[in-house]
């Protein structure tokens, strides 16, 4: 495979970041840390406080948020005003919020059985959220639609690096070459002052349960230990029904079911009615706000994957425990434990903890992350895998971010060589 020159690719990333303009002028952020800037999942964004920040409403909120980049004072926010202002007018008049994001990832392996391998891929997201009922009230009805295009820069995208390195869980999975897909097409309805929320349509259950606050491959950790919940055999995008209840603001109960045969690359519903096999889930959580700390989330969830006769796959079930907490100032921490009883993911136990620090170096919208994870496999042919990942994300302009990160993978779980491997990565994200 042709190797990608790191200096040239890094230079291209930086050049693109400098060339991009961010959002139109937004309200200046208040002094100090904000929930938005340190990547908290918006408690009121979509279906459940337990959802990941990869859900479309949260991504749109991030695009249109009051970010401040270090190049903004030099006039790099001018060129896209002609594009952004009409989009704002559409939202003001119709309640239709549109957004586009382009994310590029470069990986370079170091050591282990696949050292010196380079991979790069891109991802383009087209997102929309249309409020058609109850705009300006708590009880809104919105239609969410997103499309995505993923492509590899060379023959092998970053998603292929994990198998070559022999990892139990890949350094990344999201950056592949699957092409065009329809990700989301669902209706979300709020009732009784948003205490009841119902989701119906095409979606991915992994966006709504089992996630921690820093679970976002686009702007946070990249390794799938942290950017997903790899102990759970989520089926992908397809028919989904979700219900979330909030009897009091500090408590939630979210449940749902999805077609067990859902595949993000396919748009079909026949298998649901022909076989009736479901992936089901339930999550309950407590979301207090501590006076000297800030908001937190403490949740427990269970899930069940039915036996799938069509694909000859066995039944599986498990549970997840999650703690997210903001600490005083610009810090947040998370911890997660996940258990799977079956063999679908080859992960029996997953335990991890991490932290995020916003404002390192005095730039309030920069984010630094550090996390540790241990995965224990089901099969005795694999071994325990431990991962340490750190990254720093620079807010270049209001809507452009550049990140660099490092992963250390001790004893990759399926490798023939029992030694530590490493992965360096660089990531660019542009959005408007």
Report the location of each language-model feature.
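Outer-membrane beta-barrel architecture
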Residues: 86-88, 127-129, 186-188, 242, ...
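Detector for outer-membrane/organellar transmembrane beta-barrel domains
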Residues: 282, 286-378
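Transmembrane beta-barrel strands of outer-membrane/channel proteins
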Residues: 100-106, 143-149, 198-202, 253-259, ...
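Surface-exposed coil loops of outer-membrane beta-barrel proteins
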Residues: 156-186, 193-279, 283
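Solvent-exposed loop/turn segments connecting transmembrane beta-strands
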Residues: 113-118, 271-276, 308-314, 339-350, ...
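Short loop/turn motifs that connect adjacent beta-strands in outer-membrane beta-barrel proteins
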Residues: 80-98, 131-143, 192-195, 249-250, ...
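N-terminal periplasmic/intermembrane-space "pro-region" immediately following the signal or transit peptide
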Residues: 20-109, 115, 131-137
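Outer-membrane beta-barrel "beta-signal"
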Residues: 420-432
């Amino acid at each position: 495979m042709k190797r990608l020159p790191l200096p040239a690719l890094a230079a291209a990333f930086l050049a693109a970041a400098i060339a991009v303009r961010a959002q139109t002028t937004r309200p200046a952020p208040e002094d100090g840390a904000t929930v938005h800037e340190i990547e908290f999942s918006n408690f009121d964004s979509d279906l459940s406080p337990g959802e990941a920040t990869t859900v479309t409403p949260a991504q749109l909120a991030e695009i249109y948020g009051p970010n401040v980049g270090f190049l903004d004072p030099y006039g790099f926010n001018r060129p896209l005003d002609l594009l952004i202002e009409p989009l704002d007018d559409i939202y003001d008049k119709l309640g239709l919020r549109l957004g586009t994001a382009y994310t590029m990832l470069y990986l370079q392996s170091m050591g282990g059985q696949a050292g010196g391998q380079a991979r790069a891929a891109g991802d383009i997201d087209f997102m929309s959220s249309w409020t058609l009922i109850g705009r300006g009230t708590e009880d809104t009805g919105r239609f969410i639609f997103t499309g995505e295009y993923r492509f590899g820069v060379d023959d092998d995208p970053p998603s292929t690096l994990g198998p070559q390195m022999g990892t139990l869980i890949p350094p990344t999975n999201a950056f592949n070459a699957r092409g065009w897909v329809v990700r989301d097409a669902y209706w979300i309805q709020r009732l009784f002052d948003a205490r009841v929320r119902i989701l119906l349509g095409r979606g991915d259950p992994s966006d709504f349960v089992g996630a921690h606050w820093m679970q976002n491959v686009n702007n946070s950790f990249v390794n799938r230990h942290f950017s997903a919940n790899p102990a759970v055999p989520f089926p992908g995008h397809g028919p989904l029904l979700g219900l979330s209840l909030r009897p009091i603001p500090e408590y939630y109960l979210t449940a749902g079911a999805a077609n067990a045969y859902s595949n993000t690359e396919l748009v079909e519903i026949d298998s649901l009615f022909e076989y009736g096999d479901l992936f089901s889930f339930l999550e309950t959580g407590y979301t207090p706000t501590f006076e000297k700390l800030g908001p937190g989330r403490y949740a427990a969830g269970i899930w069940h994957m039915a036996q799938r006769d069509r694909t000859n796959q066995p039944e599986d079930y498990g549970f997840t425990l999650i703690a997210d907490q903001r600490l005083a100032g610009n810090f947040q921490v998370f911890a997660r434990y996940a258990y799977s009883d079956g063999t679908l993911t080859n992960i029996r136990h997953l335990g991890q903890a991490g932290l995020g620090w916003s404002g390192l170096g005095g730039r309030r919208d920069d984010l630094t992350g550090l996390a540790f994870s241990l995965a224990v496999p089901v099969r005795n042919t694999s071994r325990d895998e431990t991962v340490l990942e750190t990254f720093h994300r620079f807010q270049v302009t209001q809507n452009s971010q550049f990140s660099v990160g490092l992963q250390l993978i001790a004893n990759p779980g399926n490798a023939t060589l029992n030694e530590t491997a490493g992965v360096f990565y660089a990531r660019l994200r542009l959005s408007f």
